[in-house]
Each structure stands twice: as C-alpha cells, then as structure tokens.
Amino acid sequence: NNGYGVYGVDAFTYAGKKENLKNVMDKPNFNLTECSILSTELLKIIIKENDIKWVIHLAAETHVDNSIKDSDVFLRTNVNGTKSIIDACVATGSKILHFSTDEVYGCAFDESFVESDKLDPRNPYSASKAAAEHLVTSYANTYGLKYIMVRPSNNFGPRQHSEKFLPTILKKIKNGDKVPLYGDGLHEREWMYVKETSKATRFILENSKDNQVYNVSSGFHMKNLHVIQKVCDILGVDPQDCVEYVKDRPGHDRKYSIDSTKLN
C-alpha cells in the first residue's frame, strides 16, 4: 500500500498459510513463489529478474519447544537457509534486512540489553539465530554484503500460529481446557504488537545506514501468568479455572528485555 513492489518467497511449512495472503494476492505490485529458502539458484533468479534491492529475511523456525525436541530443522532453516539467502544477495548485489530475535542476548536478569552487548544464546533456537547473525556479519566483512539486523521482542497479532503463547491461551480457554504454564509462571517477556514491528521495520529500512543492528521493542513487560490472567479478565473467565502448572522446560530463560533507544 506504500508504493513498494513486494515479491514473497515462502515454503508454506506447517506454520504458513496462503490464506493469510488473500488480501494482497490480487495486488499488482505483489508476486509470490512457493519454494524453500535453501533453493539458492532460484533465489538468485528471482532477485535478479525482479531487480530486488532489499531482501527482508523473515523465514525461520521459531518455536523454542520444537528446537529442544529436534534442533536439526532449526539448523537447516535458520543457519543453512540464511547462508543460502546471503549467497544469493552477494551474487546479485542485493542488500538484506535480517530478522533475528531478542533471545540471542540470553537471560536479561535486571538489565535491558543494547545492540553492542555480547550474544549469549541459551537454547537451540536462539543459538541458531545467533549463528545466522554471525554468518551475515562475516559475509559483510568477507564479501561486502550490505545488511541491517533487527532484533525484535515477542510479537503478537492477527493470524499468529496456534503454537504461540497468546493463541494457545485463547484456544484453550475457548475449548474449555486449561492453559499449560511452565514452572511458576513468572517468566517475563517483552510484548509488541506486530503492526508496530512492521512500522519500525519500514522506518529502519528507509532511514538506516548500512551494516547496523537495531533492537525493536515496546518497553511493555509482562510475566506469563499475568498474561493469562489478563486474557481471562477480558473474557470474563476465572483465571483459577484456566491454568495448569507443568514442569518447566529445560533452559527456560527467566526474562528477556531489550533497549531500543537507538531507534529514537
């Protein structure tokens, strides 16, 4: 809607639905190819033939629980997939805006991380995203790749996959089931509405210099238990009837918190 031409590439794995794109499929400035980001040669063709200036790399496996059960697909998609994309960018001269995660910093404890802080990923998902970041910066140093790195906090919004926390809460309550809550439920996350992340991304894309890293966050923190209680309050349901405490997951970071002052 802002005059940009957009070319989408999506493998439509279990978490992707073409139906989510129904509002843009008929737009004259939107095109779509269904393929894996591991298809490097096809990516080169798409970028070159469509004169694509920026590749916005959002493709990733992101569910931490799944990464603990089986990390192979996370390494394949998040690391090898990123390598495939930046190989295509280097070959065609395109720049990349790479989406990472606030989880690469590790547990925040009392501080809010800034972009220059060291990375300390503590689960297979965040480790795969940190590895992808290092690939991007290594290609910048070695091959002259131009990039922007974005590290967002927890996003929520329309059409989010049902495995994520807020959709899980809503689905469980709707079905009359209890919401499983890890440990004591006091793990804290920083929440941001997806449209605000989109606005921030556009601002960065239009205003940033090359080879910069940005935290993107709202400053709004809430513990997992309190998120459930808030949803229950909105829906008029007794929170005591909605929560089932379960064994904490391995390596569960207590808190994530990032400082996005650089965007101001």
Protein language model features and the residues they cover:
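Hydrophobic alpha-helix immediately C-terminal to the catalytic Tyr-X-X-X-Lys motif of short-chain
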Residues: 131, 135, 139, 169, ...
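N-terminal Rossmann-like NAD(P)+-binding domain of SDR-like oxidoreductases, especially those catalyzing
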Residues: 1-155, 195
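C-terminal substrate-binding subdomain of Rossmann-fold SDR/epimerase-dehydratase oxidoreductases
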Residues: 4, 35-36, 173-264
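Proline-centered turn/helix-capping motifs that create local helix->coil transitions or kinks
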Residues: 97, 106-109, 144, 160, ...
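Residues that form or flank phosphate/diphosphate-binding pockets in enzymes
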Residues: 15-16, 41, 160, 222-226
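A glycine/serine/threonine-rich, flexible loop-to-helix segment
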Residues: 111, 162-170
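Short histidine/acidic/glycine/proline-rich micro-motifs that form metal-
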Residues: 12, 125, 154-157, 187-188, ...
